Amino acid sequence: NISPSGAMIINKDDKYCNYFISKAKMRNLNIITFSKKNKSADVVYLGERKNRNKFLCKFLIKGKIKFFLIPDYLIDFKENILSTLSIIVNYFYIDALPTNLFLNFKISKSRGTIIRYKNGKKNLTIIDESYNSNPLSFKFALDRFDKNYKNSKKKFILIGNMLELGKFSKKLHIKIAKYINKSKINKTHVYGNYTKHTFNKLKPQMRGKILNNKLEILNLIKKQLPNNSFLMIKGSNSTGLNKIIKNL
């Protein structure tokens, strides 16, 4: 559906990049590539240096070195930043891009929002990923959660159904159990029929509770999780997890 004079943004680290490049060339499209490691790409991430709550990040863009300040809560979204820069340089000159281009960008609610939940003497850190879920976004969110709180012994996840996967639903819900089993999550709680397939493939010591309704979810959060825990909640928007979190 790309017009003949259009552009195609391609991740050069992706295993299908050569396929997409060949297709784009056949259509005579403008090709812009990005990469975290391949310096032959048009937009390349070269490194970072931390300064308090932000990072000074170095990029190679169309052969020119460019620096941008990135907030610490965005530093794990490197592919998103690279693809955004690729789109921007298709329309604007590199020199016109300010260093603080990304500095005031805020993550949309329920796409990794951090909630400091307090109930009496109990304090929890909730990472709200309840806007949507698919195997790729689940793995990304899980890896980031595991990394950001690697020193904690109180890491929990609550997962809801990944919807709109069609005939592959069962297979893909089983697949994400492999990601969880390789992580350092303490317990995994599930909500929804498809997530039971995930639950059954988890290591026994990583299995938490199978939750059946809103009341059981609220009871888990308010009463059962230990103080100073970290909880990531991930599921498709229509599972209702999003509404439950909003009303905490």
Residue ranges and their predicted role:
Residues P4, K23-N30, N38, R52, ...:
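ATP-dependent carboxylate-amine ligase
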Residues M8-K12:
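ADP-ribose/adenylate-binding Rossmann-like module
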Residues R49-L56:
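A short, compositionally biased
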